[in-house]
Structures are given as C-alpha cells and as structure tokens.
Amino acid sequence: MSSFLDILGDGHVNFEKCGDVVVSPKDNMVAMLCHFCKDIFTHLPEFMRHLQWSHSDVLQFTKEQNVYRVEELMSLESSEDDVQSQANSCSSGDSGLAGEMEDADGEPGSSECLANNVEIMNALAAFDVDVDVLNNVSHEQSYSKNPPDSRTEGFRCARKPGRVEKPPSICDLKSYNITRHSRKREAIKQRLSSVKKRIMRSLENDVSKPRLNKLRSKLNNSLSSNISGPPKQSKMPSLLENSSVNELPAVLESTNPPSFDSEQPYVVSTTIKPSIRPCPSRTAVQTDRNISHQPVARRSTVNIERVDILPPINIKQKMKMSAKDIPFWESIIISSVASQQPSELNTTNNAVDQPPKRPERRSSLTVISSSPIQAMKPMRRSSMTRENTSPESSRILRSGEVESPAKANKRTKDSFEETSSSNEKGNAKRSKLEQNRCSMNFSLSASVTEYIRSDLKTSKLDLDSLLRLTEPLESDAFENTLVEDQVKNATKMGSPQKEFTKLQIGVKPEMEALKEDLRLLKTVGLLVLKDSCFEDKLPFEQSESFRKTAAKFSKIYHTYDTIWSYRKTKTIGVHQRLTEQLNSFTEEVNREIDCHLTTNEIKRILNLINSWYAYQIDQRFFRKATLSYSVEHYMFLFHFLPKINPTVYFCECCEEIFPNEARYKKHVQSVHAVHAFTCSECGKSFKRLYFYDKHLKTVHLKP
C-alpha cells in the first residue's frame, strides 16, 4: 500500500472516477457501484475486470491485461476467491450482483479488511475532492436524492439449494430397457407359440381325414370281397394222398428245369392267388436224416394258375416317323394348340372327343394282397406276334428344321424296311423258342406239390405293370393322326357348298397357318407364343436350347429400337430407311442363330411377339391373372417393348406399318386376304355372296 500512496502523492497519475464504495454496517459488507452502468460488485478484482472489459472505450486502457495489479491492491485475496466470486455472481460474466462469499484468509468483517477498505476510501475521497470538485458535487446530489438503503434488500444472497430429485443413472435406464424388451419378447413368443399350435392342429386334422378315409375304404373292400363268394378253385392237379414224403429228395434230384436258349430274352409271368381260408393245422413232416432242412416261415397257401413266356422286346428299334417327318413333341404341341383354338378350326366331328388316357405305370414292384384290386386289373394281352413299336422313352428328339418331302419319303422307306426285317427276325426266334422249350405241365409227385404249396406262400406280385411297359400305347399313334383329322375336318367345313362360275374360291386352312407360325417360332426359340406349356412336354436340354436361342434373338431385337418403337419409326418418315433397318436386322438374326429367314418371315415373327406381349400385359396388370414361370421368363426377355404406348405392326405383303393390331388385321383382311368371292371383271374380292351380288348389280349392271 505504501507504493500506491507514494504514486498518489507525486501527482503523476491520471485518475478517472469509475465508481463509489457502498458500505452496509449492519451486515459488515462492502460493495462497489459502477459509475457508468450502475452495477454493484462485492469484490474489487471483479470490479476491475468489469471496467476493463465493459468500459475500455471510455477509460482507454493502455495495456490489455493486468492494468491494475490486483495482487498489490488486494494481497489477501487469492485466485480461488476470484473463481468462486465469478461463479456466485448472478449477473452476466462481466457485471452483476454477487452473493455472499467468504474470503480465503478471513471473514469480510474482520479488522484487517475494514482497515484496508477505510484507507483506500479515504485516499480516493481526498483525491476526488482536490481534483474534480464538480464531479463530487454532482455525485453528492445524486447520492442525497437516492440514499442507500441500510437494509440488505438490495443485495442478492446465495440461494439455498432446493430438493431436486436425483435423475436416474445410466445403469438404471439400461436395466429398465432390458426388462421392457424381455417382457415384449416373452409376449411375442407366447403369441407365436399359440399360432403355431393352431396351425399344427389344423394340419393334423387335414392329414388324419384322408388316412381314415383310406382305412375305411380298404376295410370295406376287404369285407365285400370276403362276402362276395368262395375263392376260385385252383387249376393245379389234386394232391396224391397215397404218396410218401420220403420220396421228396429223389424227386427233386430227378426233376430238371426246362432248357431254354440263353440268347433269347424272356419274361415269365406268374399269377399267384392266395386263398383267404385259414391254414389248417397239420402234423410235422418226417424228413431223411441225411438231408438237413432249415425251418421255413409258413404263410397262407398259394395256387399257381399258369406260367406264360412273353415275346422278346427289341428296345433298339427306331421309331417309325410320319410322312412329314415331324418329331413327336411337335405333334403334341400342334394338337394342344389346336385344342385351345376350336373356333378357328371349325371342326364339328364329335366322334373323337379326347385322346385316350395313358395308363398309370408303377415305378417298382409292389405287393398287393387285396382281391378287389386284383379284380379291377385289365386282361393280359395274348402272346401273339405283333408289330413292335419302340416305347416313348426311346424316341429320338430332333430340333432341326423340317426336311424336304423327298428326304422324308426316303427315310420313311428305310425305317419301314428296317422295321419289317426286325419283325421277321423276331418271328423266327420266337418260333425256334416255341419248338425248343419244354411243356410246363410235366407230372409232379405229391411230395413236390406239397413242397411248392407250403413254401411258395407269398403275396401276389403285381407283374402286370411290367407287361404294360412292353405294350405299345395307342395314344402315341393317335396323337400323330389327330392333327391330320382336324385339318381334314377344317378343310371340309371351310369349303363352299356350291361352286359359282366366274369366281375364284380359295380358302387357306387354319392349321397350315398354325404350322407355319410354329415353324418360324421354333427357329427363334419362341414356341411359348403359341403354347404356354410347351416346356412341360420337352426334356430339360431341349427347353434350355430354346431359351438360349430366344435370348440371342431378344438381344439383337433390343438394339434395333427403330423397329419396335412406334415413335422412332414414325420420326424416320421414309419407308426406305425402315426397310434398310429390317434387312440388316434379318441378316444379323440369320448370322447369329444360323437360320435362313426372309424379311417377310421376320415381320410375321415380330407381329406375333407384339400381339403376345400385349395380351400378357393385359392379363397381368389389368386382369390380375397369375402367369406361369416360363411365360414370366420370356416376358422378361422382351421387357424393353412398350407396355401402354403403341407398338409397330408390319404388313407382310407391303411396306405399311400400323400402331395397333386392330388396324393391322383390318388392313390384311381387306387388302391382302384371299376371299371366297372375287369379281372376274374388276378383281375386287368379297367375303360373302350377298356383297358380291350387290356389286354385280350396282357396278357392272348385271341381273
């Protein structure tokens, strides 16, 4: 303090009045009132910082920091007091009224603090009076008008902390979330378990019903067979009761099996019928001591009806193709498409409604012991010489193009000669076998008969399923002739009943157009356009080859957007450029797919694709129909085609293009169709006789 007073006495210090000191004798508190902003501060360092930060523009400090040495002015206060005073201040960071706070070394009302404050106040007051009297007078006037209140209402005391609830800790929140999620998980598990039980209960009920029905039907069939009548008498000779049992070994040694030609394949068919009557108890059989016999499990008695030897089967024989050399899967597809379009064929022949149903074939030998099933079996065919036909599994699948009629006739003759030669060889071997084989009616002793009856007590084997595999199916030949009959009926119904003079009558059969479309679509692998289920009739390798070909065609078709987009086709404006695009597209298709298609055939294929795609879009998006997997696959190949915008339909006979199918069909029907009635004078065609007669009367003035 002495250094500070020495500076004051020299008179070289420029002082500015910044505030007044306010004292509360009752509470022993001292505060400083800012002269510029009228704020009150309880600590001198805080007041000094306030002056430096808030009123530096008026006071014009020469240094930025520590203008006044707070350590020299208030040596008793430490830095901790400054921090605490700033924290307890209720005003802003640079001003405000602070609460009560104790000094670090002693209380504010101690003698040392009061002495220091009195000396500072006296020095400042004396300096203010001597230097600036006017400021002192104005200050006294303002102080007299607003005397400081002796009470402590103007000072803000430190607030007492209220009762604040302790917030939950992180561990409590985590445990709460865990318990809540666990409760939800348990509720979901209970709900799912109840739903699962209901589903399993419904499935068990659905499965148990057909089982009960099957058991009831089997029980009823067995009861009906038992009540229907006594079992049939066996055709075996009666047992010889007088024969002795000891003759069994000798008879077995003397009996030799019939000798057959080992090179000849044969199948022995036996019909074994078990008797339903219970087996009577009989005495033990006495056997020779020199021969060891093992006990054999005994069942019901068995009667052997007859033993037949079937004719040999030539599996390597090739199938006889039709005159047009069409693979069997093509005939099936044609017949299926023809059945889907009865209105186009105009057939009225009701003699043949449906092809005969294929008999069901067993995959393995099954044991059947019930008599009603035996009664329902068809009669076995006789072992007569019959023209052999190869089974369906041995047919050769061909996907090549249709050959010329000359090659087809040549291959038909070769196959016929090969078939006739194989039939002659089979007949010769069969006659030789019949001469060499022994009769199965050799005489058996009573012991042998008893041994056979006691040991061969097995259930009946269903060998008729093997016999059906050797029999040719009439439905195979029927499917090949079905299309020819339909074509004949269509041509008969489509031909006019009367022939008129000066008329050109020419009606193209619908089946011919259908076959032509199938040939074109088969070349590009798009048979699905005519038959959506054609892949079900083909093996996997054949269907995969069709899909690869269709993928190549669609990839090429996608690059020529001026062909399938009507907007771009319309902007071209010149038919010559469109014709050039079609020609280049045809050349690229022929080069990539290795075929020989003309521009008109390409136009026909594109028209079929556009018509099929528009129909499938209508079925899927507007009629909400479910499409098959194969149709979905082929639709994805042509996903770039417009679905709602108009597409391009090309006339196959001229260079006209149309935005929709209706205009295209109308153009073809009116301009390029072959009508039944054509005028010989002007060449105009008419669909019906009425319009033709009207034309003759009005234009050519003929009665």
Swiss-Prot record:
Where are zinc fingers of the kind C2H2-type found along the chain? 32-55, 649-672, 677-700
Q: Which UniProt keywords apply?
A: Cell cycle, Chromosome, Chromosome partition, Meiosis, Metal-binding, Nucleus, Repeat, Zinc, Zinc-finger
GO MF: zinc ion binding
Any one biological process term the GO annotation gives = male meiosis chromosome separation
The ranges of region (Disordered) come to 78-111, 140-161, 205-239, 339-434
Q: Could you tell me the superkingdom of the organism this chain comes from?
A: Eukaryota
Cysteines engaged in disulfide bonds, as pairs: none
**InterPro entries per the UniProt record, alphabetical:** Znf_C2H2_sf, Znf_C2H2_type
Please give the PROSITE patterns that the UniProt record associates with this protein.
ZINC_FINGER_C2H2_1 (PS00028), ZINC_FINGER_C2H2_2 (PS50157)
Give the Polar residues compositional bias ranges: 84-94, 339-352, 364-373
| Primary residence | nucleus
Q: SUPFAM superfamilies of this UniProt entry? A: beta-beta-alpha zinc fingers
Which portions of the chain have biased composition (kind: Basic and acidic residues)?
Answer: 148-161
Record's keyword annotation contains Transferase: no
The protein's location, in the record's own words, is: Nucleus; Chromosome
Give an example GO cellular component term for this record.
autosome
Which family does the similarity line name? Belongs to the Teflon family.
Query: What functional role does this protein have?
Result: Specifically required in males for proper segregation of autosomal bivalents at meiosis I. Expression is required in the male germ line prior to spermatocyte stage S4. May have a role as a bridging molecule maintaining adhesion to hold autosome bivalents together via heterochromatic connections.
Misc. remarks from the entry: Drosophilid specific gene duplication generates rgr and tef. Teflon has a function unique to Drosophilids.
Q: What protein name is recorded for this chain?
A: Protein teflon
Q: Which organism is it from?
A: Drosophila persimilis (Fruit fly)
